[in-house]
Design a protein with these regions (language model features):
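Short amphipathic alpha-helical coupling elements at transmembrane boundaries
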Residues: 86-87, 116-126, 164-167, 217, ...
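Transmembrane alpha-helical segments of multi-pass membrane transport proteins and ion-pumping complexes
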Residues: 98, 102, 106-115, 133, ...
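Alpha-helical transmembrane segments of multi-pass small-molecule/ion transporters
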Residues: 163, 193, 200-220, 227-242
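Hydrophobic transmembrane alpha-helices that form the pore/transport pathway of multi-pass ion
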Residues: 122-192, 201-211
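Hydrophobic transmembrane alpha-helices of multi-pass small-molecule transporters
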Residues: 1-97, 220-324
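Internal alpha-helical transmembrane segments of multi-pass membrane proteins, especially GPCRs
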Residues: 100, 181-185, 220-224
Length: 324
């Protein structure tokens, strides 16, 4: 009991030290003259140092620290609301896209489509353990990059399938967390492989690349190096993140479970149809004059309609509001 109290006090003491260091650094930025920085920039830097120290120490929950940071930026007039909330208000609508990605992944999981996809992957016989599972995630990321330009959307769909693979094969929480992390880590190298990817459609990227809009030119110059990059990241990930125990993917059990599922259920068919509509929009939105976030938001909203939809109010429980 004494040892536990001592350890708890030690952690609390360390949190206080880290937070104090950050706050002190912020105060020094405000007190000492920095001619290169104007007053708003100095306030922003001081608040950022304080917020980082709070995040690092865990003195407050991360979402509350974020709220405090944004509130102080606005109260001190060191920034304006459009800049502070640009993730919600800018043309790209990145945070709306993240919100929709969570809801789409929830639909894939709740409809049973994720479990069927997971069983199909396990039953193929190609995925037998931790290393082959990580390699499979890399391959799926590569294939999905061709048809789903948004890294957020494809990562969360793949994540839903990866969770089901871990659940079906009784993977430990520690190893499951590593496998889930792989879905995000291996998504990074795939963002610029194909000209259909979201960053590649950015006019500035195309302009500075001096490749025009040639699909083949883009792939040969940027795509192939990024495929090599994906391969190297996959190998590095497998080398760095070792499983805590043996991860065994039971192909025989998965095949039996897949047979028990039978044909696609009505809900799975609906979700497959909605995914097809999403993919069609993601491929065509540059020619439609509609922002990817706003079109995705519209389609995701329609997924809540009765009869034809697959989502309900409970789906919002899968959205980590604190993270947003």
């Amino acid at each position: 009991m004494v040892v536990e109290r001592t350890a708890s006090f030690g952690k609390l003491h360390l949190k206080g030290i880290v937070a104090s260091v950050g706050l002190t650094a912020g105060l020094l930025v405000l007190i000492f003259p920095l001619p290169e920085l104007e007053s708003p920039a100095r306030i922003q830097l001081a608040l950022t140092l304080g917020a980082l120290s709070f995040w690092a120490s865990g003195v407050m929950p991360a979402p509350i620290t974020g709220m405090l940071y944004m509130g102080l930026l606005l109260i001190t007039n060191s920034s304006d609301p459009l800049t502070v909330f640009s993730g919600w208000t800018n043309e790209g609508g990145s945070l709306w896209l993240v919100l929709c990605a969570f809801l789409i992944a929830s639909g894939v999981e709740r409809s049973g489509l994720a479990r069927r996809a997971a069983l199909s992957i396990c039953a193929s016989g190609q995925v037998k353990g931790f290393q082959s599972l990580i390699a499979a995630i890399a391959v799926i990321e590569l294939l999905f990059a061709l048809i789903i330009p948004s890294a957020f959307a494809r990562t969360f769909v793949i994540l839903a399938v990866a969770k089901e693979v871990c659940k079906e094969n009784s993977v430990s929480e520690t190893d499951a967390a590593v496998i889930n992390f792989a879905c995000f880590a291996l998504a990074v190298p795939t963002t610029l492989i194909f000209l259909t990817s979201e960053p590649a459609l950015n006019t500035l990227v195309v302009e500075y690349s001096e490749l025009g809009l040639s699909w083949v030119g883009w792939f040969s110059t940027i795509g192939i190096p990024n495929i090599i990059y994906l391969f190297l990241v996959t190998v590095l990930f497998i080398r760095v993140f070792k499983p805590s125990g043996k991860v065994f993917v039971d192909g025989v059990k998965s095949r039996a479970s897949l047979e028990d599922l039978g044909r696609l259920s009505p809900k799975e068919k609906k979700m497959a149809l909605w995914l097809s509509l999403m993919i069609a929009f993601w491929l065509l939105y540059p020619f439609m004059g509609i922002g990817i976030a706003w079109g995705t938001m519209l389609l995701t909203s329609l997924m809540f309609l009765p009869r034809i939809g697959v989502l309900d109010a409970k789906a919002f429980a899968d959205v980590p509001v604190g993270t947003l």
